[in-house]
Amino acid sequence: MAGPEEAVHRGCDNHPPFVGGKSVLLFGQSQYTADEYQAIQKALRQRLGPEYISSRMAGGGQKVCYIEGHRVINLANEMFGYNGWAHSITQQNVDFVDLNNGKFYVGVCAFVKVQLKDGSYHEDVGYGVSEGLRSKALSLEKARKEAVTDGLKRALRSFGNALGNCILDKDYLRSLNKLPRQLPLDVDLTKTKREDFEPSVEQARYNSCRQNEALGLPKPQEVTSPCRSSPPHDSNIKLQGAKDISSSCSLAATLESDATHQRKLRKLRQKQLQQQFREQMETRRQSHAPAEEVAAKHAAVLPAPPKHSTPVTAASELLQEKVVFPDNLEENLEMWDLTPDLEDIIKPLCRAEPAQTSATRTFNNQDSVPHIHCHQKPQEKPGPGHLQTCNTNQHVLGSREDSEPHRKSQDLKKRKLDPS
């Protein structure tokens, strides 16, 4: 049964579902009648004959009795019916997988549960071993199957002697060896299945359908919902039995289709997002490529900045030093072969000249030495020390210019007195 239907039935206070106004019991909820119970109990008390028991040699030379798996399944079908019992594997563990000289050794344990149609069950553990195979997959397959078969036989053994519990009685096994074995029955080849079509089953199914059509569907009966008790003021709200089963089936189908549809939508959405991301990355690459090309072309067109052997700042500092400390002052004096006297320098400084004459001479001095003030930096403001140095240089130059005519007259007088 599907999961949604089981959840619906569990939520309805464990009431069985209704089909055509009749309750339908699930597996594990059916009850044996008294006759069935007595017949099954009598059959399970019987002990198995030597025809059902096999033996093999175990480790250490000991003889071990067991029942083959297919015989146990046939016995369970005879006792409970083919649809009266079921088994399930609740847990399976791989204990070890060893590789030795190219051969695999595997051990697996499995827990198997056998349940009858009335809900009673037995559960036991089985173990399977595979040794010496060179294929790992085949070793695991053999060990798993052996573990499940062993667990199934041990679980069925708990129901009674007829399903294998009698082989644990060693006294019975000793006495069993005294019984002669019956000759196996000849196989009737006429009863073997040779065709795909089974006429007896088809005829029984057809008769069942015709019987249902002859009886007709029962009239829909108005019943209250089994999921909740109807209050007094809602007593007129009733549900139809036929609609219950159809709604449950439609609910299960809808849930399954919705889950499948959601998975498809998720996959489609993921593909769309991936495609959108790829397109965005491609557009970014295309947009970055032209920008880089334009930048490269622009860099190629622009001229390279001029490379000066002497930095501008160094040149300006050199000019400033030349302005503050003029080197051509002594060269001009040496060209005239004149040596300045201390008295000639001090005398003009001691004379008191009018302001107009000093201003005129200062202007002439500035004209004779034009490079002193023209090469100064306009941005730099000279400090007080710089102004004092410039004023001192101007006074020295002015006194020398004033003393030059006086020296010339003295030289002429000396030449006249000394004819040689």
From Swiss-Prot:
Assigned protein family: Belongs to the RAD52 family.
Function comment: Involved in double-stranded break repair. Plays a central role in genetic recombination and DNA repair by promoting the annealing of complementary single-stranded DNA and by stimulation of the RAD51 recombinase.
UniProt-listed Pfam families: Rad52_Rad22
Subunit architecture: The full-length protein forms heptameric rings. Interacts with ABL1. Interacts with RPA2; the interaction is direct and associates RAD52 with the RPA complex. Interacts with RAD51AP1.
Keyword Ribonucleoprotein: no
Region Mediates interaction with RPA2, annotated ranges: 222-291
Sites of Phosphoserine modification: S200
Gene designation: Rad52
Phosphothreonine PTM sites in chain numbering: T339
BP GO annotations: cellular response to oxidative stress; DNA damage response; DNA double-strand break processing involved in repair via single-strand annealing; DNA recombinase assembly; DNA recombination; double-strand break repair via homologous recombination; regulation of nucleotide-excision repair
DNA-binding region: 153-157
GO cellular component: nucleus; protein-containing complex; protein-DNA complex
Start-end of Basic and acidic residues biased regions: 398-420
Key words, A-Z: DNA damage, DNA recombination, DNA repair, DNA-binding, Nucleus, Phosphoprotein
Entry keyword Lipid metabolism: no
Record-listed Phosphotyrosine modification sites: Y105
Protein name, UniProt field: DNA repair protein RAD52 homolog
Post-translational modification remark: Phosphorylated upon DNA damage by ABL1, and probably by ATM or ATR.
Residue ranges of the region described as Disordered: 357-420
